[in-house]
Swiss-Prot record:
Keywords linked to the UniProt accession: Aminoacyl-tRNA synthetase, ATP-binding, Cytoplasm, Ligase, Nucleotide-binding, Protein biosynthesis
GO MF annotation list: ATP binding; proline-tRNA ligase activity
Domain of life: Bacteria
Subunit annotation: Homodimer.
Domain text: Consists of three domains: the N-terminal catalytic domain, the anticodon-binding domain and the C-terminal extension.
Compartments, as annotated in UniProt: Cytoplasm
UniProt source species: Ureaplasma parvum serovar 3 (strain ATCC 700970)
SMART domains: ProRS-C_1 (SM00946)
Name of the protein described by the UniProt record: Proline--tRNA ligase
Any one GO cellular component localisation term in the record: aminoacyl-tRNA synthetase multienzyme complex
PROSITE patterns the UniProt entry points to: AA_TRNA_LIGASE_II
The protein's role, per its UniProt record: Catalyzes the attachment of proline to tRNA(Pro) in a two-step reaction: proline is first activated by ATP to form Pro-AMP and then transferred to the acceptor end of tRNA(Pro).
Length: 472
């Protein structure tokens, strides 16, 4: 049996405390003296680096090039687009003074970079021959959140923001959908998180967007988490910042824009979808250590170190971690469970005699005796099966938790059971707010699929199937 770590609260006891104890015990985040400003420890940063590396590859396949924008934005620039500043004004961090000198014109620390990209695009686009332009940056942004939680709501968080301009509405809107597909494939195939794709309601759109496409994931407590978004911005920002190009007709036209983003919030989803009461469960593609080699009393038997070295040579194309300390094997295994290592290989005197090792799967806790000579053949199959199992479990949980409802009473019952609801809905923002007061759930997205039905709240005919859930 692996050593039980007393500091981990169980999900049944308190889900929020469980989440925090996982974050702390897995050495993901360290708090600082500034509210919401957190240290992303090496374990968390390794996950983020793996996410960055894979998404960057996918973006480049679609002609996206990286750049870096400044951190500060003149506040006067926000005034050009009133709706946008209304969306972010309460969250802005401001720079009002440099040294002893107070500024006549304040700067905002970027909460997002539409304004910076707009000014950049304005200066580099001239004619239709320059289009499309597709750029992305990996950076941190700052928003003064009232309530902060690691990964879910940081005052400073890391993300990528992709911005692109096109000659036509169809091109910009189509590319927004392409990027949403990139996110969907990545989150499902690499993070093993099943998602629901859809369109945000008008009142849930990104400030300034004509359409916001989203992927929503379900956490183990039944709440939804918006995992990534892609927006068709139309000509809203183009007109505010005068981004024009000369078309083939020799006339000047405003560009059409899109933007998209995925942040370190997705690490919070990774925890709340897969982790258990022993710690993280990381999909093999994203795990900072894919395999841990744990020797049992190697300080008393140096031969075990030679076996460990042989194993490392066999498996050198994986991310490996070795622990040859004199800590008990129960403690070593428990630590790897907390950190979500997909496979642990135990090497002891007994195994040495039989020229075998014991493999422990993180997802099922199953122990398997394997001949040393078979390791190279068995490990890739095991990792593939772990990945499949993690995804299938999460997918079944999601599918079992979506319930179709016909009226507000049914919605109340479903949400009270920590599930999500699917319903025909053609109401207003005010209707949505009233529904939230009654049920604690709100609209998350409108499904891609369309059917004819009757709105469960207004009784109007509609073809909009909508997801309702409590949400982070």
């Amino acid at each position: 049996m692996s050593k039980k770590l007393e500091k981990i609260t169980t999900r049944k006891e308190n889900f929020a405390d469980w989440y925090t104890s996982i974050v702390n015990n897995a050495k993901l985040i360290q708090y600082t003296d500034i509210k919401g400003m957190m240290v992303f420890q090496p374990n968390a940063w390794a996950i983020w680096e793996a996410i960055k590396n894979q998404i960057d590859v996918e973006f480049k396949k679609h002609g996206v090039r990286n750049l870096a924008m400044p951190t500060l934005i003149p506040l006067s620039e926000f005034q050009k687009e009133k709706d946008h500043i209304e969306g972010f004004a309460p969250e802005l961090f401001m720079v009002n003074q440099i040294g002893d000198k107070k500024l006549d014109n304040s700067y905002a620390i970027r909460p997002t970079s539409e304004i910076l990209f707009c000014n950049y695009f304005k200066n580099i686009v001239n004619s239709y021959n320059d289009l499309p332009i597709k750029n992305n940056q990996w950076c941190s942004v700052m928003r003064a959140e009232k309530t902060t939680r690691p990964f879910l709501r940081n005052a400073e968080f890391h993300w990528q923001e992709l911005h692109a301009i096109f000659a036509s509405e169809n091109e910009a809107d189509s590319f927004a959908k392409v990027i949403l597909d990139v996110y969907t494939d990545f989150v499902q195939n690499y993070l093993c998180i099943p998602v629901i794709k859809g369109l945000k309601t008008p009142w849930e759109r990104f400030a300034g967007a004509q359409k916001t496409y989203t992927i929503e994931a379900m956490m183990q407590d039944g709440q939804a988490l918006q995992s990534a978004t892609s927006h068709y911005l139309g000509q809203f920002f183009a007109k505010a910042y005068d981004i024009k190009f000369q078309g083939q007709d020799n006339q000047m036209h405003y560009v059409h824009q899109m933007s998209a983003g995925l942040s370190t919030r997705i690490i919070g989803a990774l925890i709340m979808v897969h982790a258990d009461d022993q710690g993280l469960i990381l999909p093999p593609d994203i795990a900072f250590n894919q395999i841990a080699i744990l020797t049992i009393f190697s300080n008393k038997n140096p031969q075990l170190l030679k076996i460990s070295q042989q194993i490392c040579e066999q498996l050198n194309n994986y991310r490996l971690f070795e622990d040859h300390s004199d800590k008990g094997i129960g403690y070593k295994l428990a630590q790897q469970e907390i950190e979500g290592t997909p496979i642990c290989i135990l090497v002891g005197a007994k195994e040495l005699v039989n020229q075998q090792v014991v493999i422990v799967r993180r997802d099922t806790h199953e122990k398997i005796n394997v001949d040393l000579t078979d390791l190279k053949l068995i490990i890739p199959k095991l990792l593939a099966d772990i990945k499949r199992n993690i995804y299938e479990k999460a997918k079944k949980d999601l599918e079992d938790s979506i319930v179709f409802v016909n009226n507000i009473e049914e919605l109340k019952q479903v949400i009270a059971q920590n599930k999500m609801a699917k319903a025909f809905f053609d109401g207003t923002k005010e209707d949505d707010e009233q529904i939230k007061l009654l049920t604690n759930a709100s609209t998350r997205c409108i499904f891609d699929e369309t059917q004819n039905g009757q709105c469960f709240y207004t009784n109007k005919k509609t073809n909009k199937l909508t997801l309702f859930a409590r949400a982070y």
